[in-house]
């Protein structure tokens, strides 16, 4: 009611304003106006309700038609609003005119009152009927709107129907054309069959057939064209015409400037064949992104050309830098300030202190005195707190002398046993060195680079470095192979003060993206951890390439547990006036490790290993070291069968798996690890109690590092080494390691070594101790390039692709295979097969018997070796037993031994003495015989797959059937470097036949199979580092 009253007041006020001219109003006029007001109010309410209803209806309808006719619905709404506004204006004008009429007709007010009353009654009675009429009107309006919508829908449907009719008509026309073309083609084909016969002159006609076939294909494709595709083709044609018009217009404009454009126009207009060919490829190639992704076959690049281009690019990027042309920022290396307590120490006190600290020996001038506590080395409080937090109470012997020497800015060679804290010895001075320099700007490389030989050691150093770098606000990036390079590139681009890397991946980073990933301009501190392995011949080129790109006045530090004398000369090439700090002698196993060496047979090693595992595994973790990846996997299977859960770690495992295996082993998830020497360096595992050298280490340094995995940080450890009699040459290094570490040498090991020395002396050989540093890496020189070219020539020759200049290469590979065969040919005269029954004694037989007796007498005369020699060995033994004397070995003269040795040598050299040939001729001169041809092909030194291919049952059977020769496999396989014992032979194929041609055919087929396999191996060859460690 409040709203109605307000409305009533507003309406009355408006009426008061409109009727302000006649101020004198009668009571009857007021009543009639009130009635009119009431009626108008009721009408307004009805109108509002009806409008709201109509709005709801319209909304629901508009929702249904929204997707198809949004714009039309908006126009209808606007037209409705216009109609409503017009109707409102009409109502207002009518109400105003009524008011004027009421004011002008005041004299006949009574009659009008009566009329008004009667009208009000009629309206009151017919109120319901008026409402119904209004509803009818609204329904009619809605129906009109529906009709309008239906009209639009019908119009759309009509358009679609016409479009379909056009498409159907077009399809029908296409079908008719296709049928006509097919009929014509059939007629032509029949005419050609009837009227033509093939001749050499018709070769030119065959060239036209593909074009006709293409036409037929295009016409058949047109039959199955979808209407939408046809429409899109029309659009493309229009776009193309538009582009051609624009090109022609541009050409016409440019035609005035010079004659060159005229040539372009003529090319476009005359070369129709090119345009047709382009049509088949696709339209608008400049706008077709999908088509641009595919390159044409004509633009293929030669693989070898691309490879050589890449190699030359790599060489350019990694060439040594001319440091004289670069202005480097000055930096400070000497930060060490000697505290008064150390300054007061005399030289004698310093020597005594060094002797107490496990016998520190120092070489080099100007070495500072060793420190006694962390506060004396000049590090910040943040680092001191971190040291205390992580349990570093006091410096170890190597740290006491190495830290002040490095803080003084000197180059250093640090030699200390495993687990002695070498990592902290070079990390603490590095932090002080970096903090003294300005912070990195965008695009600048690191300040410190730490290089390691293995990925595991790189990860371990990174983990140790991050303990301190977080508090100092420094960034550390570990760069190593085997993982995705993109993440490492992203980290380097963000900037890092410290890079821990393996040399191979570091070179990749320096060469990546034309050297924009990182650079070595800011590097002033270089660390080589495990420096002896870094300077092994396999690693030297990569290490030197990185070091040569660093500024010459850098500070370089080297650390290792072993440092052979042969490596010192190489190390001094990159050091300037170094100080050598050695702790505890060179390469010594820690005294906390109890070492045991067991001389054992190969078959009993696994049972002994199970015994050790049963005794030690409950006390902690165990590492078993083997020499090869295959042995690691084989031993893993054997241990799993014996119910020992374990894991294997070697260079052939993916890097992600290697990381997870090391983490599981460190965390104690798995307590047994079978590994090659990949895990022997820098791997720090807590609670590692036992190391088993299942395969004996082949040099001293390898033994030291293997045994050094246990007994770290003052804990007790055990190291067992298995050695067989065949591995006696390694016993000397193990005896040396035991003696230097103060461990008693087992007597059976000493006996094994002394027997081996005696044997070598008897054979006239010199005993050489292997240092383990004889591996060779890639030298990137002309010799290697020549070898690579030779390999390519052999491949070309084998495949028949050689040039006329390279015809000799075809013979080379056959000559190499022939030399490896080391073939031995023999021709034997065999007796002709006859009847098994003995022949009757005839005159001929008697003559043969006489010849045999004479030969026997002559042999006895030639071999007149005394009375004992005429009696056989059995007779000698019988005589000894009858006499009752001791049974002695039968006496054999030196001449007999010499003859036996000569026969063996002759057999090896495939030599038949002349005397024997004469005897055979005399024996077989009058007998019926046939020749048997034999040839032996030694295949022991060929690759395993080549041997398998030749010695397979199917291959031998196929060769025998083809050549009609018998082929047998004889001898045993001996690995490279191992010579067969007396009476044994390397594996070989024996070919036998009565026909010499059959033997030659069999040999040629065997040669062909081996050649194919060798070529296949060369093509699939991946250059790998055969050493124990890899730079990845």
UniProtKB/Swiss-Prot annotation:
Residue span(s) of domain Helicase ATP-binding: 403-581
Protein name: Probable ATP-dependent RNA helicase DDX46
Gene: Ddx46
Family: Belongs to the DEAD box helicase family. DDX46/PRP5 subfamily.
GO cellular-component term (any): nuclear speck
Subunit structure and binding partners: Component of the 17S U2 SnRNP complex, a ribonucleoprotein complex that contains small nuclear RNA (snRNA) U2 and a number of specific proteins. Within the 17S U2 SnRNP complex, DDX46 is part of the SF3B subcomplex, which is required for 'A' complex assembly formed by the stable binding of U2 snRNP to the branchpoint sequence in pre-mRNA. Recruited to the 17S U2 SnRNP complex following release of DDX42; DDX42 and DDX46 bind the SF3B subcomplex in a competitive manner.
Source organism: Rattus norvegicus (Rat)
GO molecular function, one term: RNA helicase activity
Disulphide bonds in the chain: none
Organismal lineage: Eukaryota, Metazoa, Chordata, Craniata, Vertebrata
């Amino acid at each position: 009611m409040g709203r109605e009253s307000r409305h009533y007041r507003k309406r009355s006020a408006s009426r008061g304003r409109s009727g302000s001219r006649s101020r004198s109003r009668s009571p009857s006029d007021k009543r009639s106006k009130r009635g009119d007001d009431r009626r108008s109010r009721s009408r307004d309410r009805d109108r509002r309700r009806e409008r709201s209803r109509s709005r709801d209806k319209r909304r629901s309808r508009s929702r249904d038609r929204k997707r198809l006719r949004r714009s039309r619905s908006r126009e209808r709404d606007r037209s409705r609003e216009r109609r409503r506004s017009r109707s409102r204006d009409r109502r207002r004008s009518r109400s105003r005119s009524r008011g004027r009429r009421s004011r002008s007709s005041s004299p006949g007010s009574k009659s009008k009152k009566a009329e008004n009353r009667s009208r009000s009654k009629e309206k009151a009675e017919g109120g319901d009927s008026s409402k119904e009429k209004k509803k009818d009107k609204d329904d009619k309006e809605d129906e009109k709107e529906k009709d309008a919508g239906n009209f639009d829908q019908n119009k759309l449907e009509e358009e679609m129907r016409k479009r379909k009719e056009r498409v159907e008509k077009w399809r029908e026309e296409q079908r008719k054309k296709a049928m006509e073309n097919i009929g014509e083609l059939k007629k032509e084909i029949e005419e050609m069959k009837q009227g033509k016969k093939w001749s050499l002159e018709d070769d030119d006609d065959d060239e036209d057939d593909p074009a006709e076939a293409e036409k037929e294909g295009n016409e058949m494709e047109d039959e199955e064209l979808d209407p939408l595709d046809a429409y899109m083709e029309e659009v493309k044609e229009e776009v193309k015409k538009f582009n051609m018009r624009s090109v022609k217009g541009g050409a016409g404009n440019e035609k005035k400037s010079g004659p060159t454009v005229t040539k372009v126009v003529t090319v476009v207009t005359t070369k129709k064949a090119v345009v047709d060919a382009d049509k088949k490829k696709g339209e608008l190639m400049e706008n077709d992104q999908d088509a641009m992704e595919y390159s044409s076959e004509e633009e293929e690049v030669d693989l070898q050309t691309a490879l050589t281009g890449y190699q030359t690019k790599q060489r350019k990027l990694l060439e040594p830098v001319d440091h004289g042309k670069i202005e480097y920022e000055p930096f400070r290396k000497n930060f060490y300030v000697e505290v008064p307590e150390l300054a007061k120490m005399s030289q004698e006190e310093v020597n005594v202190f060094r002797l107490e600290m496990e016998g520190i020996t120092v070489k080099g001038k100007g070495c500072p005195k060793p420190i006694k506590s962390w506060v004396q080395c000049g590090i910040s409080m943040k680092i001191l707190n971190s040291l205390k937090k992580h349990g570093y109470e006091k410096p170890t012997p190597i740290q006491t002398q190495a830290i002040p020497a490095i803080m003084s800015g000197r180059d250093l060679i640090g030699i200390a046993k495993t687990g002695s804290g070498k990592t902290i010895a070079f990390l603490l001075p590095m932090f002080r060195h970096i903090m003294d320099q300005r912070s990195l700007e965008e695009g600048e490389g690191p300040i410190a680079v730490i290089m390691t030989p293995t990925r595991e050691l790189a990860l371990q150093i990174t983990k140790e470095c991050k303990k301190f770098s977080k508090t100092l606000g420094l960034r550390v990036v570990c760069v190593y192979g085997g993982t995705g390079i993109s993440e490492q590139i992203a980290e380097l681009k963000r900037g890092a003060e410290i890079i821990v890397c393996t040399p191979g991946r570091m070179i990749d980073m320096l060469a990546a993206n034309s050297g924009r990933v990182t650079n070595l301009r800011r590097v002033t501190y270089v660390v080589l951890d495990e420096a002896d392995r870094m300077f092994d011949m396999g690693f030297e080129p990569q290490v030197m390439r990185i070091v040569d790109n660093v500024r010459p006045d850098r500070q370089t530090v080297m650390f290792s547990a072993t440092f052979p004398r042969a490596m010192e000369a190489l190390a001094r090439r990159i050091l300037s006036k170094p100080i050598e700090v050695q702790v505890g002698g060179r390469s010594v196993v820690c005294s906390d490790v109890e070492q045991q060496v067991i001389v054992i047979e190969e078959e009993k090693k696994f049972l002994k290993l199970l015994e050790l595992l049963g005794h030690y595994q409950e006390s902690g973790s165990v590492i078993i070291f083997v020499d090869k990846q295959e042995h690691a996997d084989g031993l893993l299977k054997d241990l799993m069968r014996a119910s020992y859960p374990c894991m294997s770690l070697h260079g052939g495992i993916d890097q992600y798996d290697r990381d997870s295996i090391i983490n599981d082993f460190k965390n104690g998830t798995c307590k047994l690890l079978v590994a090659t020497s990949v895990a022997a360096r820098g791997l720090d595992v807590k609670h590692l109690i036992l190391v088993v050298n299942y395969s004996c280490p082949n040099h001293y340094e390898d033994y030291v590092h293997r045994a050094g995995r246990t007994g770290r940080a003052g804990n007790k450890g055990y190291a067992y080494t298995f050695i067989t009699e065949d591995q006696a040459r390694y016993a000397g290094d193990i005896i040396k390691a035991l003696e230097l570490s103060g461990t008693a040498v087992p007597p059976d090991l000493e006996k094994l070594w002394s027997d081996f020395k005696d044997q070598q002396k008897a054979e006239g050989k010199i005993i050489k101790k292997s240092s383990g540093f004889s591996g060779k890496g890639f030298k990137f020189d002309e010799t290697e390039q020549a070898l690579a070219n030779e390999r390519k020539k052999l491949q070309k020759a084998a495949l028949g692709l050689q040039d006329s200049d390279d015809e000799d290469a075809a013979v080379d590979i056959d000559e190499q295979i022939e030399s490896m065969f080391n073939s031995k040919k023999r021709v034997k005269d065999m007796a002709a097969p006859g009847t098994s029954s003995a022949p009757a004694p005839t005159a001929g037989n008697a003559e043969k018997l006489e010849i045999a007796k004479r030969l026997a007498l002559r042999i006895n005369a030639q071999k007149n070796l005394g009375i004992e020699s005429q009696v056989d060995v059995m007779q000698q033994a019988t005589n000894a037993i009858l006499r009752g004397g001791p049974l002695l070995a039968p006496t054999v003269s030196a001449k007999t031994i010499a003859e036996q040795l000569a026969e063996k040598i002759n057999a090896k050299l495939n030599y038949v003495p002349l005397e024997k040939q004469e005897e055979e001729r005399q024996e077989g001169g009058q007998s019926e015989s046939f020749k048997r041809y034999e040839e032996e092909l030694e295949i022991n030194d060929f690759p395993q797959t080549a041997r398998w291919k030749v010695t397979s049952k199917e291959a031998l059977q196929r060769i025998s059937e083809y050549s009609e020769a018998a082929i047998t496999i004889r001898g045993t396989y001996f690995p490279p470097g191992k010579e067969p014992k007396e009476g044994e032979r390397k594996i070989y194929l024996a070919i036998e036949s009565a026909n010499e041609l059959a033997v030659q055919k069999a040999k040629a087929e065997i040669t062909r199979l081996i050649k194919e396999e060798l070529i296949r191996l060369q093509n699939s060859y991946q250059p790998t580092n055969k050493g124990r460690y890899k730079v990845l």
